[in-house]
């Protein structure tokens, strides 16, 4: 398979970025210009290359806006936002450059949002302890409205995505098909993690309850939006796919789109680590100090591992690798002793996907997708679908990167079916 970089991680992220081109997140010429300046496993060259393109796209957007070119300005601002997002991507979250660059990504995106065909509402969802969850509610333009009220897709970020990046999948396509799409960041995501240091939480059903309550209140306070809170779907990819399944235990959620989820983060970790050594540590034969030293040394010698360890520690609110790995065990669909199985609580329609191109970076079809499908005992076979493509063009990579247009098509075909939406053939 062709690669853009000899670094597996860099190639994956470059494919992820280029894959947003169909929805306005990247330009091929800008992509080629940046890639030619990036050195293998060199985060500084990555950052310099993408910051150059971000600032360039921002200037183009400003020039187009000054000239009155609404469409061209919007497109340039979208690209600038996406390039600013990836500029600090290879840095650890404690790097002082990260937050200002993400804030620039947000600023560029908001400039694009006011130029979109449908209304975009910037929302702050009340969470807890005075914290709010930021998001964008993308509404269908008048020409794309369906008969009746507007169904809603709630789209949660994963471990490393942002609410701005989420636009390039469902935020772009959904409103054009008559859906309202809420792209949001929960605890441990976006600036809530990078700036406020709020970690991820495994029981995302608690977060989902806050989101549903917010939509109820918004629908009541703004009845002219005609939001259909009786037709709510929850979507997410990778870690977000796990979150979507936890959210689907809420009876208000009528459909779940779980893209390449993991069943157990700890088990996923074991599948990518020296399993025997991890088991010895987990059983107490290897002390924490030895394990932490080993992990830190390994991270310094392997860029991808070091990056993942840094992200994991910040996402889990852990100072040491041992604390991080222990917290991984909380992120599971396996029920605690004596509890009702989590997947038994799901009764809505479920669309499950898995990676199948031999590059299952952060999920496994066999250990996660198919296992979850088998354990959804209270969802009739007619209400659950599985899609595990093997070719990259079909969505074989993790989170379906490089094939988001096809993923969007399959997603909304599924939602149309279960939300009883009929469309005439063209």
Swiss-Prot record:
Which Gene Ontology MF annotations are present?
hydrolase activity
Which Enzyme Commission number(s) are listed? 3.7.1.-
Its top-level enzyme class, in one word, is hydrolase
Which superkingdom? Answer: Eukaryota
The record ties this protein, via SUPFAM superfamilies, to:
alpha/beta-Hydrolases
Q: Which Pfam families match?
A: FrsA-like (PF06500)
Pathway per its UniProt entry is: Mycotoxin biosynthesis
Q: Which InterPro entries match?
A: AB_hydrolase_fold (IPR029058), FrsA-like (IPR010520), FrsA_esterase (IPR050261)
Q: What keywords appear on the UniProt entry?
A: Hydrolase, Virulence
Q: Does the keyword Transmembrane apply?
A: no
Hydrolase as a keyword?
yes
- Which family does the record claim for this protein? Belongs to the AB hydrolase superfamily.
Q: What does this protein do?
A: Alpha/beta hydrolasee; part of the gene cluster that mediates the biosynthesis of pyrrocidines, fungal natural products containing a macrocyclic para-cyclophane connected to a decahydrofluorene ring system that show potent antibiotic activities toward Gram-negative bacteria. Within the pathway, pydG catalyzes the Knoevenagel condensation that affords the 3-pyrrolin-2-one ring, using as substrate the polyketide-tyrosyl acyl thioester product of pydA.
Q: How does it assemble?
A: Homodimer.
Its protein name is Alpha/beta hydrolase pydG
Which species does this protein come from?
Answer: Acremonium sp
């Amino acid at each position: 398979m062709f690669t853009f970089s000899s670094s597996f991680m860099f190639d994956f992220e470059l494919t992820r970025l280029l894959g947003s081109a169909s929805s306005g997140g990247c330009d091929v010429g800008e992509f080629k210009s940046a890639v030619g300046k990036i050195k293998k496993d060199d985060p500084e060259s990555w950052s310099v290359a993408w910051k150059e393109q971000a600032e360039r796209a921002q200037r183009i957007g400003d020039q187009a806006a000054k000239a009155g070119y609404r469409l061209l300005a919007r497109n340039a601002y979208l690209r600038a936002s996406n390039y600013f997002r990836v500029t600090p991507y290879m840095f650890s979250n404690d790097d002082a450059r990260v937050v200002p660059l993400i804030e620039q990504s947000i600023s560029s995106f908001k400039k694009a949002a006011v130029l979109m065909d449908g209304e975009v509402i910037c929302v702050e969802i009340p969470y807890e302890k005075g914290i709010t969850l930021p998001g964008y509610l993308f509404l269908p333009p008048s020409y794309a409205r369906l008969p009746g009220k507007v169904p809603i897709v709630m789209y949660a970020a994963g471990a490393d995505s942002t609410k701005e990046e989420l636009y390039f999948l469902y935020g772009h396509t959904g409103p054009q098909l008559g859906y309202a799409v809420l792209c949001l960041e929960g605890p441990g995501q976006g600036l809530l993690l990078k700036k406020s240091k709020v970690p991820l939480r495994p029981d995302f059903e608690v977060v989902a309850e806050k989101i549903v309550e917010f939509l109820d209140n918004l629908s009541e306070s703004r009845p002219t939006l005609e939001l259909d809170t009786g037709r709510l779907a929850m979507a997410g990819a990778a870690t977000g796919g796990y979150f979507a399944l936890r959210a689907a235990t809420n009876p208000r959620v009528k459909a779940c789109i779980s893209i390449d989820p993991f069943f157990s983060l700890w088990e996923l970790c074991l599948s990518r680590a020296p399993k025997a050594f991890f088991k010895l540590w987990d059983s107490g034969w290897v002390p924490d100090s030895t394990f932490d030293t080993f992990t830190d040394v390994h991270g310094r010698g392997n860029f991808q591992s070091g990056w993942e360890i840094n992200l994991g520690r910040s996402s889990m609110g852990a100072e040491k690798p041992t604390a991080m790995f222990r917290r991984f065990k909380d992120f599971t669909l396996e029920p605690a002793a004596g509890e009702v199985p989590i997947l038994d609580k799901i009764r809505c329609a479920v669309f499950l996907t898995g990676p199948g191109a031999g590059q299952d970076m952060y999920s496994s079809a066999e250990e996660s997708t198919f296992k979850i499908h088998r354990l959804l005992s209270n969802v009739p076979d007619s209400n659950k679908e599985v899609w595990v493509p093997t070719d990259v063009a079909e969505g074989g990579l993790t989170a379906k990167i490089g094939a988001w247009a096809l993923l969007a098509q399959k997603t909304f075909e599924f939602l149309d079916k279960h939300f009883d939406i009929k469309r005439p053939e063209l």
